[in-house]
Regions:
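Surface-exposed, Lys/Arg-rich phosphate-binding patches that contact polyanionic backbones
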Residues: 6-26, 61-80, 84, 102
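Short, positively charged interaction helices/loops
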Residues: 37-73, 92-116
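Short, basic amphipathic alpha-helical segments that act as recognition/interaction helices
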Residues: 21-44, 76-100
Length: 116
């Protein structure tokens, strides 16, 4: 799946993502920590947000299917769903030191062994 993030959001994600695959881990973690009912989906194209260059996102078939279904229900793109989820998640992340630490532990746990 191809993802285009607004520049500010891309910078926030980059602060947490250190190696290849971390973006997908962050998206999956954010999806599990944001309540779908409370989400306000923001259109990325129509809002005229400056977007970064496209990047590939590998979240797995189950998550991809769930994102597509959600996007169809809302009548928006999958990119708009992911951007909205990440923006809401990073608002919470800035306010919660515990959530930030939980994310970092989750990322480290999922990386597995990295040679030094």
């Amino acid at each position: 799946m191809t993802l285009r993030l607004p520049l500010e959001l891309r910078e926030a994600v980059t602060e947490e993502a250190r190696v290849k695959g971390d973006l997908a881990r962050i998206v999956l973690f954010a999806l599990s920590h944001v309540d779908r009912k409370d989400m306000e989906i923001q259109q990325t194209r129509k809002a005229g947000l400056p977007l970064c260059s496209p990047q590939l996102l590998h979240v797995g078939a189950e998550a991809r299917t769930a994102l597509r279904e959600w996007a169809e229900e809302e009548g928006v793109s999958v990119n708009a769903i992911v951007v909205s989820v990440l923006e809401e998640f990073f608002k919470r992340l800035k306010r919660s030191k515990a959530l930030r630490e939980e994310l970092r532990l989750e990322i480290r746990a999922r990386r597995g062994f990295l040679p030094s």
